[in-house]
């Protein structure tokens, strides 16, 4: 018995299924390759973040600006504040509550992560440069995060840790990822 494996001899519906499987396999391999390229690029563009962490680099100017903006925002929303360097204090029920606006409080990691996410994509340079406009948005959300933590402290200082460690740490990560996805889809 002679079996001819020529695809043209197979019924038409089986040929289509064979092509679909082949194309699905090619698309899957392409998607894996693109994901690997993205991850490599992301890590390369994250080198400034890694370098700053390893060297202990801190930019005091950004800490000062962040403190100034937060104090102005707190004051403009009716919350009395005092500031000593980068320590901001607000009145609470039994006295004052203060917190230090540290280097990590500036949102620098989130801003660098946003930069790396944008530039790791395969989009044209023009779109990437337009995406950089989202970095100030990340900074503004971070400022609101700090304001909210001081605001919630005026209600009850026990809420500060919850707001800081849980809600806003994850909230800032979510914000960066949501802005990045929005940028990829819409902008």
Provide a role label for each language-model segment.
Residues 2-187:
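Hydrophobic N-terminal alpha-helices or hydrophobic patches in metabolic proteins across all domains
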């Amino acid at each position: 018995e002679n079996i001819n494996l020529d695809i043209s001899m197979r019924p038409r519906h089986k040929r289509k299924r064979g092509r679909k499987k082949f194309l699905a396999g090619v698309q899957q391999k392409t998607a894996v390759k693109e994901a690997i390229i993205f991850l490599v690029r992301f890590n390369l563009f994250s080198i400034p973040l890694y370098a700053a962490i390893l060297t202990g680099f801190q930019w005091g100017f950004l800490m000062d600006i962040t403190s100034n903006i937060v104090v102005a925002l707190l004051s403009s929303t009716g919350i009395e504040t005092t500031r000593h360097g980068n320590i901001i204090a607000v009145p609470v029920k039994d006295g004052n509550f203060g917190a230090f606006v540290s280097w990590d409080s500036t949102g620098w990691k989130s801003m660098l992560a946003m930069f790396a996410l944008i530039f790791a994509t395969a989009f044209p340079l023009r779109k990437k440069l337009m995406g950089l406009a989202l970095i100030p948005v990340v900074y503004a959300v971070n400022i609101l995060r700090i304001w909210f933590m001081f605001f919630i402290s005026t209600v009850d200082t026990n809420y500060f840790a919850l707001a800081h460690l849980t809600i806003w740490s994850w909230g800032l990560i979510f914000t960066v990822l949501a802005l990045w996805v929005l940028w990829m889809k819409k902008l």
